[in-house]
Amino acid sequence: MSKLTVATTQFACSWDLNNNLDQAEQLVREAAAKGAQLILLQELFATPYFCIEQDHKHLALAEEYSSSSLLKRFAALAKELGVVLPLSWFEKAGNAYFNSLAVADADGTLLGVYRKTHIPNAIGYQEKEYFSPGDTGFKVWDTAFGRIGAGICWDQWFPETARCLALQGAEVL
């Protein structure tokens, strides 16, 4: 693997979902302009972290992989800028809901989905009210800039996450 420039982004999300997506896009553009090739956005960046409460109205925020406007928008952005974007979103798949991540390659191709395996349930983290445990297994993707693997948030506390990704040949976690 050659040299890879990675950028991370973070911003305060509001219930103005279009504004959140615009902010995320602007941060991706800024990072790409500074030479970043792999740009990470925060978990569930389209909305505030709604899992602090139990309210099933939030289920309406979920989007299916094949029709997700978020994924389409940011895959097109990845292509325009020639960058790789791991994209966290609230996924609806059939009758199940997941905290998921899709990777948009530098040519705009969506390479597939990873669904968060370890779902926390504690004060301020009511994720089991919204998300099923992932059913994809840990994923590694061949991208324009190397083999990347990803866990989502709580997954990091479990050593098998990194071990499984490394055994699959991930060069970057």
Residue positions per predicted region:
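Extreme N-terminal starter segment of soluble prokaryotic enzymes
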Residues: M1-V6
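Structural detector of well-ordered beta-strand residues that form the stable sheet scaffold
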Residues: A7, V84-P86, G149, L173
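Generic enzyme active-site microenvironment
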Residues: T8, L41, C153
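Short polar catalytic/cofactor-binding loops
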Residues: Q10-L17
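Active-site metal-binding loops of divalent metal-dependent hydrolases
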Residues: F11, L44, D155-Q156
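Cys-nucleophile CN-hydrolase/nitrilase-fold catalytic domain and related Cys-dependent amidase chemistry
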Residues: L17, Q26-D107, V113
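Short, acidic/polar
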Residues: N19-E30, Q156-L165
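Active-site catalytic loop in hydrolytic enzyme cores
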Residues: E63, K92-V172
